[in-house]
Amino acid sequence: MSDSTYKAGFVSIIGRPNVGKSTLLNRILGEKIVAVSDKPQTTRNVIRGILSDETSQIVFVDTPGIHTARTRINRAMVDAAMTVVTGIDLMLLVVDATQKIEETFIKDICSKAGAPIYLVLNKIDQVTPKEKLFTVIEGYTRLYDFPEIIPISAQSGSNIERLVDLVREHLPEGEALFPDDILTDLPEKFIVAELIREKVFRLTNREVPYGTAVVVEAFAERENGLVAINATIMVERDSHKGIIIGKKGVMLKKIGEQARRDIERLLGTKVYLELFVQVQERWTERTAMLRELGYE
């Protein structure tokens, strides 16, 4: 196939928190590179996932959920999400098909768009009765003239291939933007930290996960092929430290075991993971700390 017919471009994935944006990206790539949990605001950074084949390269840009920001870290997350609304070739606006249509939010996003917007109706497997889906689609059709409305289930994979095909058709012709053998331009240490943070979100409750961050302090491959990783889970309060460690260290061990399994799948090798917990009071409001962690 000639280079002139090769397609490549940037596609942003935006939407409210907890609508399934990160699950969608992981499903498209066939690999977990983004932290996922049932708690909103799990994603904090702009994350690029790269899907390449013989005909095209799609650079998906996953963003933090757009929400009302009350803390410095939340403001940084929303700023990051809105930054990628411009300068891309296509936008995928992901909404939860089971939730009420947010007219003001949809109109606001569409008015700021600098590229065509495809509406992605996620969680269609949870819509009951199934006939209700037609009513949902009609509601969004009245709001904005979307070139495409694609019902999907990121969890089950339903209609994902159709979505990717439609995205690919829209891309401009051009050369690949990244090497064709990578899934993301993020360093492995970042993804490892994300996988650990995901387990904190999944296994702890209330405000605890929102005041945590993970820093990978050491990442080294030994002669026997084993990868040794030391990581620190930062929290804002002593009480949170106690919750994450758990009685007799049970919770920290559980976080470590589940994270290690995901990291081993990611790296394709055995992993030795050692976790520490450190208190950094009000780190979510400290500009220098947020910048160091890559949130600003």
From Swiss-Prot:
Keyword annotations: Cell inner membrane, Cell membrane, Cytoplasm, GTP-binding, Membrane, Nucleotide-binding, Ribosome biogenesis, RNA-binding, rRNA-binding
Region (G5): 152-154
Record keyword Nucleotidyltransferase present: no
The name this protein goes by in its record: GTPase Era
Region annotated G3, chain positions: 62-65
Membrane-topology descriptor: Peripheral membrane protein
Residues at which GTP binds: 15-22, 62-66, 122-125
Region annotation (G4) ranges: 122-125
Limits of the KH type-2 domain: 204-281
Family: Belongs to the TRAFAC class TrmE-Era-EngA-EngB-Septin-like GTPase superfamily. Era GTPase family.
Function of the protein: An essential GTPase that binds both GDP and GTP, with rapid nucleotide exchange. Plays a role in 16S rRNA processing and 30S ribosomal subunit biogenesis and possibly also in cell cycle regulation and energy metabolism.
Keyword Ion transport applies: no
Any single GO BP term: ribosomal small subunit assembly
Gene Ontology CC entries for this record: cytosol; plasma membrane
Domain of life: Bacteria
Region spans: G2: 41-45
Annotated compartments: Cytoplasm; Cell inner membrane
Gene source species: Trichlorobacter lovleyi (strain ATCC BAA-1151 / DSM 17278 / SZ) (Geobacter lovleyi)
Oligomer and partners: Monomer.
Stretches assigned to the Era-type G domain: 7-173
Annotated region described as G1, given as residue ranges: 15-22
GO molecular function: GTP binding; GTPase activity; ribosomal small subunit binding; small ribosomal subunit rRNA binding
Pfam families: KH_2, MMR_HSR1
InterPro entries in alphabetical order: G_ERA_dom, GTP-bd, GTPase_Era-like, KH_dom-like_a/b, KH_dom_type_2, KH_sf_prok-type, P-loop_NTPase, Small_GTP-bd
